[in-house]
C-alpha cells in the first residue's frame, strides 16, 4: 500500500496570470491537500472516496478526476506495451472544490504520482506533468500548469513551456508567511475564466509585463520590497473581485494591518495575504476569520511555501 499527499497551491500570485504558482502548506503541520492511497487487489480496478469534502464529488465515478487520471495513465502505459496492475485507488478529499487552492490539481497530481510509483515509475517527471496539465484542462477548459506544477514539484514555479521544460523553480522568500482565507463559498474555474475580457488595452499589457518582469527580477536578486510592490494584478483581479465577498474592503484592511500584498488565490474565492513575520500573520489570520469567512465551511491557515511538493506519507 502507498499513500501520496499532494499539497494545496496558490496560482497566479497576483502578478503571474497562468504563469506563476506556489505550493503551500500550513505551518502547524496539518495537511492542506488531498491524499490518494493505492493498493493491490486480485483483479480489475476499484475507486473509493473519503474525506471531509467527499460529498462535493460527482456521484458518477466516471466523472471523478481520479478515475480519469487512471484511464489516461492506463492508455499511456499501453502505448509503452504494458498494462496497469489490478488496483484500488482511494481519494481522501480534504480540499474544498472551487476554492482557488488547486483542489482538482491535488487530486490529479496525487493520483498520477501514486500510479507512477506503483508501476515502478515508467514515466518521467515531465511526462507526468504533461498528463497532469491535460487532465486539468478538461476541468477548466484550457490546459494550464500553474496549479499542477507547484503542487507536484513544490516551491514557486514559473511556467516557461520552452526548451523542453514546462516550468522552472523561482527563488523565493522563505521568511514570508502566507495567510490563506477560504470563505466557504464556491467559485468555478470555468466561471472565473469566462468573466475575463477577450482583449486588454496596451496600457494594461505594458503594466502586466513590467510587474511580472520586476517580480521575477526581484526574486532572483532577493529584493523583498520590490517583489511585494510588483505583486499587482491588472489581468484578472479587476474582473473577478465581484465574485468575492467584500474583497476591496478586506484587501485595504489587510494592508493597514501590515500585509506586504493581498490578492486572489487562483480563480478564488480564497484570498492570500503575505506577512513579513509571524506576528503580522497572526493579526491577519484573526482579521480574516472575523471579516472574510461566510459560513462554517470557511477556514484560515497561516502557511509557508511548501518546497517539497507531492510526497509519500505514512
Curated annotation (Swiss-Prot):
GO terms for molecular function: ATP binding; homoserine kinase activity. It is an enzyme of class 2 (transferase). Belongs to the GHMP kinase family. Homoserine kinase subfamily. GO terms for cellular component: cytoplasm. This is Homoserine kinase. It comes from Haemophilus influenzae (strain ATCC 51907 / DSM 11121 / KW20 / Rd). GO terms for biological process: threonine biosynthetic process. It holds the Pfam family GHMP_kinases_C. ATP binds at residues 96-106.
Amino acid at each position: 500500500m502507498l499513500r501520496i499527499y499532494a499539497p494545496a497551491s496558490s496560482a497566479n500570485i497576483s502578478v503571474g496570470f497562468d504563469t506563476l504558482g506556489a505550493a503551500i502548506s500550513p505551518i502547524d503541520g496539518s495537511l492542506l491537500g488531498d491524499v490518494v492511497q493505492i493498493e493491490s487487489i486480485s483483479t480489475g480496478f476499484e475507486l473509493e472516496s473519503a474525506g471531509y469534502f467527499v460529498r462535493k464529488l460527482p456521484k458518477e465515478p466516471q466523472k471523478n478526476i481520479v478515475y480519469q487520471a487512471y484511464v489516461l495513465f492506463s492508455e499511456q502505459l499501453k502505448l509503452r506495451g504494458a498494462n496497469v496492475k489490478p488496483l484500488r485507488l482511494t481519494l481522501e478529499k480534504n480540499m474544498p472544490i472551487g476554492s482557488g487552492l488547486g483542489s482538482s490539481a491535488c487530486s490529479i497530481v496525487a493520483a498520477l504520482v501514486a500510479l507512477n510509483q506503483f508501476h515502478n515509475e515508467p514515466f518521467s517527471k515531465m511526462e507526468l506533468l504533461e498528463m497532469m496539465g491535460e487532465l486539468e484542462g478538461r476541468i477548466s477548459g484550457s490546459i494550464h500548469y500553474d496549479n499542477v506544477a507547484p503542487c507536484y514539484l513544490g516551491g514557486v514555479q514559473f511556467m516557461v513551456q520552452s526548451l523542453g521544460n514546462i516550468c522552472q523553480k523561482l527563488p523565493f522568500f522563505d521568511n514570508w508567511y502566507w495567510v490563506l482565507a477560504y470563505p466557504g463559498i464556491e467559485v468555478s474555474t470555468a466561471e472565473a475564466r469566462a468573466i475575463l475580457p477577450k482583449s486588454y488595452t496596451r496600457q494594461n499589457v505594458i503594466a502586466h509585463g513590467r510587474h511580472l518582469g520586476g517580480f521575477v527580477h526581484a526574486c532572483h536578486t532577493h529584493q523583498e520590497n520590490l517583489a511585494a510592490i510588483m505583486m499587482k494584478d491588472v489581468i484578472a483581479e479587476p474582473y473577478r473581485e465581484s465574485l468575492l465577498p467584500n474583497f476591496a474592503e478586506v484587501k485595504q484592511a489587510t494592508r493597514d494591518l501590515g500585509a506586504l500584498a493581498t490578492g486572489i488565490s487562483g480563480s478564488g474565492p480564497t484570498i492570500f495575504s503575505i506577512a513579513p513575520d509571524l506576528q503580522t500573520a497572526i493579526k491577519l489570520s484573526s482579521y480574516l476569520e472575523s471579516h472574510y469567512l461566510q459560513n462554517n465551511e470557511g477556514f484560515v491557515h497561516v502557511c509557508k511555501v511548501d518546497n517539497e511538493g507531492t510526497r509519500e506519507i505514512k
